[in-house]
Every structure is written in C-alpha cells, then in structure tokens.
Amino acid sequence: MKNGKIGVTTENIFPVIKKFLYSDHEIFLRELISNAVDATQKLKTLSSIGEMKGELGDLTIHVAVDKEAKTLTVTDRGVGMTAEEVDKYINQIAFSGAEEFMEKYKNQSIIGHFGLGFYSSFMVADKVEIFTKSYKKEAKTVHWSCTGTPEFEMEETDAEHDRGTTIVLHLSEDSLEYAESSKVEELL
C-alpha cells in the first residue's frame, strides 16, 4: 500500500478544475473515452511493431452506469499502467504520458493527452478509482483512489484484472443524472 500526495503546484487545484477549468461539465466523459481510445491505439501500435506479444482480444471500450451504487465506469483493454506509470501520469497532474509515447513512436497517430483531462472526472465525482494492469509481462493490478483532495491511495495487488484500465466515478449528489443510462447514451 502506498499513500502519498498528488504533485501539484497549488493546494487548490481541484476546486479550480471542478468549477472553472471546464465550463462544460459533460467534457469528463469525452476525456475518459479519449484516454481509453488512446490506450487502445497505443496497444495496437505496440503490437504492430512487435513490442506487445499475445492476442489483442476485444478492444471495445465499455461505459456502464449503476444507478443504485451511483457510479459511472469506463473500461478499456488498452496498454494499462504499472504502478510507476500511475505515479508518473496520474499523480503528477498535467504531465502527459502521450508526449513520451509520441516521441518514441513519432510516425503513429495518437490523439489526446492523459493529463488534466482525467481530472475533469472530479467535476461530477466525489471519489475516483482506477484499476489498471499493464500489458507488460508480470504486471500486477494497480488500484488508485482519490476523493478530490491532493491525497490519494495506491497499491499493487494480486487481484484479477484484465489488461487495461477501469475508471470508476463515484458520482456526487449533484451529478446523479450521469448514473442514468439515457443521459450517458445521449452524451455518447
């Protein structure tokens, strides 16, 4: 188990993100789906150049809502992340993992950047959890959670999780419409 603080330049970054950075509250879903598409594209790229061994399998991105649990979940079977990558790309706000990847694989088309966009989730969620497992051999599942403060919890676990990333948004009381299938379908 690792506890730590998310690296930010100001203690008040989350209220800024929640209230001012994104005037369109529905951007969070586009950002999460864009990140899932990026992760899937990266996996395809790595597979095509022989750096990822094994079957790609079903690369469909899934969005699910649970009205009772008040959650919205986005799941992909892309590259996933190791604990070190979560530390680097999630815990250091605004650093984009896509930049490094694009530099290494310049000729490939990669959209979006995993950075601040992920944090738009806190506009609608009181708590965000990530369950992720890298495509890399011997990778462990990483569980990360944050309640919208600069503090997070992260641990590697032996829990079964397919390659890829699942992001669970525990919706805030004023955003429960995103636990409605009809609302999410409208946005997609």
Outline where the language-model segments fall.
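GHKL (Bergerat-fold) ATPase N-terminal catalytic module, capturing the glycine-rich phosphate-binding loop
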Residues: 1-178, 186
